[in-house]
Structure formats: structure tokens, C-alpha cells
């Protein structure tokens, strides 16, 4: 555990004995299915593309381009220089996927911070390497004996990096609660020995390089800075439910799952009925949540706070579920790295299967889930590490013809400020995936303009667009596909970096650009 805590800081800075004949499999498949989207023709290779019709022009925000003028190019240039967002450093590439023609470009080979547009690269790589039917397995094993109603020995939860295990994003039976109830139904009344978490599918470094500590710690409730782990549960976050008490007293705090983290409550309930300034901070060196500030007398709210040690969080949550099922526990809770002599394989009791990858990448792209993205990134990475995932991503990109010399891949979510991508590389990935064998799953994973419960819910209504958003401080991006009235599908990538004006103006400009592409 000490090693994990040390690595966490480093990463931020730079049944069988009971007579069970087989394994009970829990299918965590959610109820909803993605909306199908029609496929598109393949794009031509880069060597066959026609020259750009974009206007030859330089601007304060755009650099130079040398290409014939076109109405689309003039309109897009106007949008980028009309004073709304001209202080941004802009990158853009727009390509007709039917003809391969470049319709517009601006700094297409310059490197930009992609923010969550990095998830396009991550999910494309995962879909190509793992396939849309890939499913994670999380197993409960037992090595010991059972006398009467008492299990004695080692219970091992063997993780595979499944981000959906107990997740609120893809609703289904809670696997830990189901396991506990099944044990109780089989007559178990007490468990003695060791409860061990095997998280070795991933390495022990929970954070990738380049995350902005100040930024992610101030984004409570947005799944920012969640630790990656080979054994994860409930999105690796604890829900801190806060409600007002009497004036002058600390607010009431309840945790879900209960008993999994400590709370240091230094907040107060004010005498006012409105106006709250409560802050919920995480302490990276331990599973402690710190509350400060004030809450109004009418306040009720929930903040999701990432836990620092997902493995111990999972094990402690299982202990709570066992007790809730009426099973007494006298167990030592251990990370497998703390066990001097690793337990034998024992026998499988239960297995939890994740939904297929096609549904997992839809969570990543439609809801921009950073935790799912990081788990997926390490899943296909060599050695279960961020560095191994970076190398494998680079190999995929080079295989499909992307020039990676100006690309940097340090994480799967795009939270890293050490990620770099060019507009050309992004469009080349989009073009490749538009004719990929898994293109149906690919298109179904992308948010559509105005689609409920996605990052485009309030944007681009009635515009035929499927695209991934991206946002960090001083970064806005949108990349994906637009469909024109004649049915032609256009791939586009728009990046805005280093602006000092209001972010909403940049976002509005990007949306206006996309509408022009779709005309």
C-alpha cells in the first residue's frame, strides 16, 4: 500500500469447498443499446488526396495556407477572424470521405492539446485491437475449507481492469452485493481468514504523466483524477451525500459505499436559506475526504470523490456487502502485493462479466468518461501501464498510415497536458474508422448533435453530426463527422488552444464551423 501511495504522488507530479460445481457468471449487460448509424465510404489514402481548396491566407490566429479559394473556405476563415475567437491558436482539417478531397485546412500539421478528443484515439485503438465483443472478467476465488457455515481461508477478488464493475454508468446488479447474497443463500454465516485483492493486471502507477493537479482536484463530481487500477469498483469514487443540519453545526454526511473512506468534516451549516460554498477535497495520501466551507439551511447535494486506493476500496466495499447480507467477517484485507506468499489459485466461485466493448466505448465517447478511458487505455497497453499503452497506440497509428512524429500520447482520457495531436492525424483516424470492420460500433459510440445524456445534448441540435467534444483550460476541440444533404459524409477536426477570451465564444465558433461543413 505504501508503494501505491508513493506512486500516486509520483504520478501526479510529473466458493469449491461449499460444493459449487462451477462458476456463477453475472452478466453486467445494461438495458440500453446504442443507436445505429449508417456506414460511410472509405477515405482515400493520403497520397491520393487532392489539393486543398482553402484560401491562401494568413491571420493572427491561423498561420499560412496555400490553396485555391472556395466559398466554404472563405466562410470558415470569416468565422475564425470575426473577433469572437480570433485570439485562439486554431487548427482545422475538413475532408470529404467519398472523394478524399481536403475541403479546408488551417495549421493541419501543427500539434495541439486535444483534451477529450484524445478519447477518439483511445477508443479507435481499443476497438481495433480488442474488438467490439471483448468483455472483462472479474472473479471471486476461494482457497480454504468450509466447516458447517464458516469459510476459513483466502478469498481472492481477481481483477481485469473492468471499469464497469459496480459502475453507475452502466446500470445492472451490483456484483459485490450479488456475490454476498449468493454466499448467504449457500449457507455461509461467517468468513475468517484473508480477503485479497489482485490488481496486478495493471501496474501500480495510478496516474499518467501530465495531469494538472490544481485543475482535476477542483473538478469534484466530474470524475476527474480517478485512479486507474486492475481492480476497480463503483467507478473508483465514493459518493459524499451532504445535507444541512442546524445552523452552526457541521452538515450531515453519508457515504456510498458506507465505511470505505474517512471523513474530516470542518464545514458548517449557515443560518441562510440559500448560498453554499462547501468544498469537498480528496487527500491523495489516504482514503480521507475533507469538507470545508458552509452550506445553506436548505442544502442537499452529492459529490463524487475519487478514492486513492481502488483495490482497498473494493475490498472494504465487499466487507460491507457481506455484513449487509448477514455474514460475519473476521478477515485481514490485503492488496496482493502485501502478501508474502501469494495464495494458490483455489477454485472459482463467481465471475462477473462486463458488457461488450461496444457499450463501454459508447460511455467513453458519449459521456466523455475519463475513468473508463484510462482503464481502457491500460487494458490494451503492454504490461498494463500507461507507457505500454502509449507505445501500442503509436504502433496502431503508424500501421494505419498516421505520421506520429508530432504526436504525444500520455493518457487515454486527454486530461494530460502532455498529449499532442495534429488535425491531420485526427482526421486520418476518423477516415480509417469510417471504413473499419467495426465501423457500426464505432459510429454508434459517438454523440449526435442534440442527443440526450451526451456531451452534445445542448449543442448542434438538428445538425447531422457525430462528434467528440474536448475541453480543458484554454482548450476546446470537436472532431467527428458531418453529413451533407446529398448524403456525403465529411470528417473534420477543429482545435482551439491558448485563447484568453471566454470559452463559450470558442465553442460557439466551433459549432458554427460544423454547421457550415454540414451545409
For each predicted feature, which ranges?
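Small-residue-rich helix-loop
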Residues: 89, 103-105, 367-370, 374-519
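Short beta-strand scaffold segments in enzyme catalytic cores
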Residues: 92-94, 138-140, 479
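Short active-site loop at a secondary-structure junction
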Residues: 105-125, 361
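Conserved serine DD-peptidase/penicillin-binding transpeptidase domain
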Residues: 2-10, 19-83, 129-403
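Residue-level preference for non-acidic, small/hydrophobic
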Residues: 100, 119-126, 195, 231, ...
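N-terminal glycine-/serine-/threonine-rich phosphate-binding loop
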Residues: 62-73, 98-114
Amino acid at each position: 500500500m505504501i508503494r501505491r501511495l508513493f506512486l500516486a504522488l509520483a504520478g501526479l507530479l510529473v466458493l469449491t469447498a461449499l460444493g459449487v460445481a462451477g462458476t456463477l457468471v453475472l452478466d453486467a449487460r445494461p438495458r440500453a443499446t446504442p443507436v445505429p448509424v449508417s456506414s460511410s465510404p472509405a477515405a482515400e489514402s493520403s497520397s491520393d488526396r487532392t489539393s486543398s481548396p482553402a484560401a491562401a491566407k494568413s491571420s493572427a490566429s491561423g498561420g499560412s495556407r496555400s490553396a485555391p479559394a472556395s466559398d466554404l473556405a472563405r466562410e470558415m476563415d470569416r468565422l475564425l477572424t470575426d473577433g469572437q475567437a480570433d485570439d485562439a491558436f486554431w487548427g482545422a482539417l475538413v475532408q470529404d470521405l467519398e472523394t478524399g478531397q481536403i475541403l479546408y485546412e488551417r495549421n493541419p500539421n501543427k500539434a495541439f492539446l486535444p483534451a477529450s478528443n484524445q478519447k477518439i484515439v483511445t477508443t479507435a485503438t481499443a476497438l481495433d485491437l480488442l474488438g467490439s465483443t471483448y468483455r472483462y472478467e472479474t472473479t471471486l476465488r476461494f482457497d480454504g475449507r468450509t466447516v458447517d457455515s464458516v469459510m476459513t481461508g483466502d478469498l481472492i477478488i481477481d481483477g481485469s481492469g473492468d471499469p464497469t464493475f459496480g459502475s453507475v454508468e452502466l446500470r445492472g446488479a451490483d456484483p459485490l452485493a450479488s456475490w454476498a447474497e449468493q454466499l448467504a443463500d449457500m449457507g455461509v454465516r461467517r468468513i475468517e481468514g484473508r480477503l485479497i485483492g489482485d490488481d496486478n493486471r495493471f501496474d501500480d502507477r495510478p496516474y499518467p504523466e501530465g495531469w494538472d493537479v490544481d485543475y482535476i482536484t477542483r473538478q469534484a463530481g466530474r470524475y476527474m483524477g480517478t485512479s486507474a487500477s486492475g481492480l476497480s469498483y463503483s467507478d473508483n469514487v465514493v459518493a459524499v451525500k451532504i445535507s444541512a443540519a442546524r445552523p452552526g453545526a457541521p452538515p450531515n454526511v453519508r457515504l456510498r459505499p458506507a465505511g470505505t473512506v474517512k471523513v474530516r468534516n470542518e464545514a458548517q451549516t449557515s443560518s441562510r436559506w440559500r448560498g453554499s460554498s462547501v468544498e469537498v477535497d480528496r487527500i491523495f495520501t489516504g482514503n480521507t475526504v475533507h469538507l470545508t466551507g458552509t452550506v445553506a439551511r436548505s442544502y442537499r447535494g452529492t459529490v463524487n470523490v475519487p478514492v486513492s486506493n481502488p483495490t482497498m476500496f473494493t475490498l472494504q466495499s465487499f466487507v460491507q456487502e457481506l455484513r449487509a447480507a448477514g455474514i460475519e467477517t473476521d478477515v485481514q484485507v490485503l492488496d496482493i502485493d502485501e502478501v508474502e506468499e501469494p495464495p494458490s489459485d483455489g477454485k472459482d466461485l463467481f465471475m462477473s462479466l462486463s458488457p461488450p466493448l461496444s457499450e463501454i466505448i459508447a460511455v467513453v465517447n458519449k459521456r466523455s468518461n475519463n475513468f473508463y478511458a484510462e482503464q481502457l487505455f491500460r487494458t490494451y497497453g503492454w504490461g498494463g501501464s500507461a507507457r505500454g499503452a502509449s507505445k501500442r497506440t503509436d504502433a496502431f497509428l503508424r500501421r494505419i498510415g498516421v505520421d506520429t512524429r508530432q504526436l504525444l500520447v500520455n493518457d487515454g482520457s486527454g486530461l494530460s497536458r502532455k498529449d499532442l495531436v495534429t488535425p491531420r492525424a485526427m482526421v486520418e483516424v476518423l477516415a480509417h474508422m469510417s471504413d473499419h470492420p467495426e465501423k457500426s460500433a464505432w459510429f454508434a459510440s459517438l454523440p449526435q448533435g442534440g442527443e440526450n445524456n451526451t456531451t452534445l445534448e445542448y449543442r448542434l441540435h438538428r445538425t447531422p453530426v457525430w462528434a467528440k467534444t474536448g475541453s480543458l483550460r484554454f482548450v476546446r476541440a470537436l472532431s467527428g463527422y458531418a453529413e451533407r444533404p446529398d448524403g456525403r459524409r465529411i470528417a473534420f477536426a477543429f482545435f482551439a488552444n491558448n485563447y484568453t477570451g471566454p470559452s463559450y465564444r470558442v465553442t460557439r465558433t466551433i459549432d458554427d464551423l460544423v454547421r457550415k461543413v454540414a451545409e
